Every structure is written in C-alpha cells, then in structure tokens.
C-alpha cells in the first residue's frame, strides 16, 4: 500500500509540475516602430498566440532595434538568441539569390501586384528556399512602395547624379543607384535619421510609413513620389527551433502567424495613404510628383539592373512577377464600372 501511495503522489506531483510549467518564451525582434504595419503585425501575433495557447507561450516583442539591429538580427536568429524576425526582403541575398527579385526596380506596378505574386506558387516557393540555411519562412508582410527622398528635388535620373543614397545591404539596390550615377551607402536602419541629418548621405528610399514614423521628412527637403520598388518583409523563424516544437504549439503559432500577417497587410494597405497625407500635412518636405514621361525615364535608366541579376534570380521568377501586374478580369470590370460612374 505504501508503494502504491508513493506512486500516486509522484504522479500527482508530475501532473502538477506539467500544469505549472513555465511558458515557452518566444522573442520576436524587429527594427521599426510599433505603429508601422510590421510593428502592428508583431503585436497581433503576440495577442493571438497567447490567446490560442494560454499558459503555453509568452511572446516578447522587441521593436525599434531594442534587441538586435538589422545588421545583427539574422546572426542572432541562427544562433538561437531570438526566435522570430521579420527582416526586410533585401536582407536575404546572402542566403538565397532568388529573393533578390523583390529589390528589382520598377518590377511591380503596385502593392496589389506584389500580393498576387507572393500568393502564387512561385512566391510560396521562396518561403522554403532557405531551409538548408536554417531559416523557415512563414509569409510576407507589406510595408509599401518606396519613395525617393533627398535634399534636392529629384525629377529625372540625372538629378540623382553624384548624390549619396542610403541603401540596405543589397547588391541589387547598389546596382539600382549606380545605374543613375548615384553613390549608394550601406547604413543600418537605426542610423539613417542621423546620417540624413548630418549629411553623411544626401538621400534615401523608403515607404511612407517609415518616412513618417522615423521622421525622415524632417531632415529631407524633398520627397519624390516614385513608387519605384517594394519594401516588404518575410517573417521567419529558426528552422531547427520550429521543427522541435510540439505539434499543438506549432499548430497554434501557425494560426496566430497567419492572422497576424493578414492583419499587418491590411494595416499596410489602409495606412499607406494616411502616412503619405501626414507627411504632406507636416509641410516639412516638399512633394515632387513625376509626370508619366519623367517616370518612364527613371524606369528606363534602372531597367538594365534586371538583366544583370536575371541569372541569379531566375527568368521564370521574373516572368511570374511581371505577369502578376495583370489585374484579374473581375477587378478590371469593377474598376471600369467605378470609372463609368464618375
């Protein structure tokens, strides 16, 4: 009887210990503000994950490079010092050349075309293209189309000649600015404001969300509405960490991630115009609108960058991205109907 009693006590203790086990800590690090689409997506992931897996997980969100800057975060992920990141798509060139497709200038007509490509089979393949490097991709978060800013108006490519532009660590972006005889400078995102303010660089490229939330428009005299490229993110995890999670935890986190990505992209779509208007209302930088002819000149000047990186990226991927610019027939009819009513 005494042995049975001891066994029962041991079982009760083990059940109690399991019930009171500390939650799995998940560190989600990023380099932008909470108010941006990526920041909002990260907070939504925390909210949904902790609701779906009560007591099992605790998501700690670190915005604004609080934990790791954009120059160190990938290394930290692979070392297991952080579990989830959402780096800019420009950061993946050293892990797979194919993701460089998102840096090609004037590839996508608008953010809807980006979404169509990313949701296609070709776009989905890129999420699993780095598993051999220890990176697991969940999905894509949009920020917006990029605008050019500088301390002088940029209307034609020759206006950029000789200017120093901050870029991310991307060979494609480096080639993009060299194509217009500008001087690209690789600078960490957290250092961009100071670099612009002090004149270390003359200009930069950013979507409206980053321009406003990081106050770049306060230290740049002009913003050219170029929509020349995409700034987006891939939400990723350490592949080994992800594969080692229990199935129920993976299921809950996958559901939370899907909801958070959809939410982040909804915020991006809604807030892009709002951030643009806020920049205009602040009246600290002048907006430069390109004519169709001027925009065509920028496109023509930067288009050779495609051919330079076609072999690395793959012509099939580039063709699929170009095809995504074709709007579905249903969308075309809806737009025509609205146009007829005007």
Regions found by a protein language model. Name each.
Residues 22-113, 121-342:
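N-terminal secretory/targeting leader peptides
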Residues 2-9:
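Sec-dependent signal peptide recognition
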Residues 15-21:
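Sec/Tat signal peptide C-region and signal peptidase I cleavage site
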């Amino acid at each position: 009887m005494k042995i049975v009693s001891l066994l029962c006590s041991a079982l009760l203790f083990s059940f109690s210990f399991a019930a009171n086990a500390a939650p799995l800590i998940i560190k989600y690090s990023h380099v932008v503000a909470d108010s941006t689409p990526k920041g909002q997506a990260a907070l939504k992931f925390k909210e949904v994950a902790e609701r779906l897996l009560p007591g099992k997980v605790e998501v700690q969100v670190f915005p604004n490079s609080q934990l790791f800057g954009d120059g160190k975060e990938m290394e930290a992920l692979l070392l297991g010092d952080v579990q989830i990141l959402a780096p800019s798509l420009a950061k993946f060139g050293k892990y797979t050349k194919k993701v460089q497709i998102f840096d090609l200038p004037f590839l996508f007509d608008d953010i809807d075309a980006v979404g169509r490509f990313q949701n296609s089979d070709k776009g989905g393949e890129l999420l699993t293209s780095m598993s051999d490097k220890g990176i697991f991709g969940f999905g894509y978060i949009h920020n917006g189309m990029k605008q050019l800013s500088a301390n002088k108006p940029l209307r034609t490519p020759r206006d950029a000649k000789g200017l120093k532009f901050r870029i991310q660590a991307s060979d494609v972006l480096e080639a993009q600015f060299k194509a217009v005889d500008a001087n690209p400078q690789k600078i960490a995102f957290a250092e961009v404001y100071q670099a612009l303010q002090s004149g270390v660089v003359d200009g930069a490229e950013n979507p409206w969300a980053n321009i406003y939330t990081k106050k770049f428009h306060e230290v740049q005299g002009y913003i050219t509405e170029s929509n020349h490229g995409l700034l987006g993110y891939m939400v990723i995890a350490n592949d080994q960490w992800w594969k080692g999670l229990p199935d129920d935890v993976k299921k809950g986190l996958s559901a939370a991630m899907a909801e958070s990505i959809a939410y982040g992209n909804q915020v991006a779509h809604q807030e892009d115009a709002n951030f643009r208007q806020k920049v205009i209302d602040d009246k600290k930088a002048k907006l430069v609108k390109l004519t169709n002819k001027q925009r065509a000149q920028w496109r023509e000047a930067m288009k050779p960058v495609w051919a330079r990186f076609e072999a690395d990226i793959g012509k099939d991927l580039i063709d699929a991205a170009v095809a995504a610019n074709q709007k579905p027939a249903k969308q075309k009819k809806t737009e025509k109907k609205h146009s007829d009513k005007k």
